Amino acid sequence: MESRVLTGGATAIRGGLPLLRKPAAVMKFTTAAHAISRDFPAGAVTAKPVGPLIAGPNLIWGRQLRPAILLETSPKRESIKPCSAAASSSAGSSDSSGDAKVGFFNKATLTTGFFFFMWYFLNVIFNILNKKIYNYFPYPYFVSVIHLAVGVVYCLVSWGVGLPKRAPIDSTQLKLLTPVAFCHALGHVTSNVSFAAVRVSFTHTVKALEPFFNAAASQFILGQQIPLALWLSLAPVVLGVSMASLTELSFNWLGFTSAMISNISFTYRSIYSKKAMTDMDSTNVYAYISIIALIFCLPPAIFIEGPQLLQHGFNDAIAKVGLTKFVTDLFWVGMFYHLYNQVATNTLERVAPLTHAVGNVLKRVFVIGFSIVIFGNKISTQTGIGTCIAIAGVAIYSFIKAKMEEEKRQKKAA
């Protein structure tokens, strides 16, 4: 996608300029420079560099930045687009339009795929380590605080070194992010309560309903029309994940209710985080959400689990695994939690909330599969069939969604 340059600044020009010999021609940068020097006296035309050639308000960000030279001839400006540096010395090394070719790793599809891969990978590690901690330290409120606290420290250090640069936040953005952070905190705590109360697979079975919550919210809250075909394509996804989870199924009302509350909370967070990204990049958005969410999580952790932790909670955990392993486990589970959520937020910035939710369901298949292997659970035929159905459902959804997007582009082009 070519970045187009729009600038309100006037290009410097002196009166009485003759027209260019070929006003409609688009030439290479070096050819343009020779033509200008040949056809006009020195100082007759001032070329104004735009985009990355100068600093200031003319810097335009697109999928790919291309430098351009604007020449003002009569009432009309013409853009002379240069080829790449290599192309300027070798004719035929680029296409006739002079557009710089997009590198393989700059393709949007590949980049989005990489985000999804890292999201899945980090989430699998987090879920396995998190469940191992709950096996000897069943205090989900405190562990939830540790998850967020490690992430907040990570954000503060990143801001300190300028990676990324901290975006200032005003009162309007704070008001927008506060309810999002509250739902993030509520969804996070209730998810951990469910993970501590039941097996990993059961929690993910209930949370597989998230796409339906997202679809309903997108249609009835945001006013987006979700076609029937997309609704139907979500059915095999949820059914498949549910089937894959049944081999570890151990019903528990606390775990079930907590997972349902988590679904509703994360649905609100996903949709309104998308709105918050209009004025701030996703990395800074998630950093501020983590800080505010930590404040919300502290009171319940102190009042609900504080007395138990001081009496025997910490001592029991240290007696079972040792102080070093206990502290190390808490640190790494917090780090993986923050990283996988950061990547998930970056992924949400690139796709629609419903697509993000379906990807989240497929992620659960990976989590269930790895948890079966790590914790020594037997894999049944039903688990394998359910996994295949879920993957097939995601493929059907992706095909229908891509076809709909292509039809929209064709209508706009017409």
Swiss-Prot record:
Transit peptide (residue range): 1-78
Database matches in InterPro entries: Sugar_P_trans_dom, Tpt_PEP_transl, TPT_transporter
Pfam (any one): TPT
Chloroplast intermembrane topological segments: 79-108, 163-219, 305-382
GO molecular function: antiporter activity; organophosphate ester transmembrane transporter activity; phosphoglycerate transmembrane transporter activity
SUPFAM superfamilies the record matches: Multidrug resistance efflux transporter EmrE (SSF103481)
GO biological process assignments: transmembrane transport
UniProt keyword Chaperone, yes or no: no
Membrane topology: Multi-pass membrane protein
Topology Lumenal: residue spans: 130-141, 241-284, 404-414
Main localization, broad class: plastid
Alphabetical UniProt keywords: Chloroplast, Membrane, Plastid, Transit peptide, Transmembrane, Transmembrane helix, Transport
GO cellular component terms, semicolon-separated: chloroplast membrane; Golgi apparatus
Transmembrane segments: 109-129, 142-162, 220-240, 285-304, 383-403
Keyword Chloroplast: yes
Cellular location(s): Plastid, Chloroplast membrane
Function: Mediates the export of fixed carbons from the chloroplasts into the cytosol in the form of triose phosphates.
Family that this chain belongs to: Belongs to the TPT transporter family. TPT (TC 2.A.7.9) subfamily.
Protein name, per record: Triose phosphate/phosphate translocator, chloroplastic
Origin organism lineage: Eukaryota, Viridiplantae, Streptophyta, Embryophyta, Tracheophyta
Gene it is expressed from: TPT
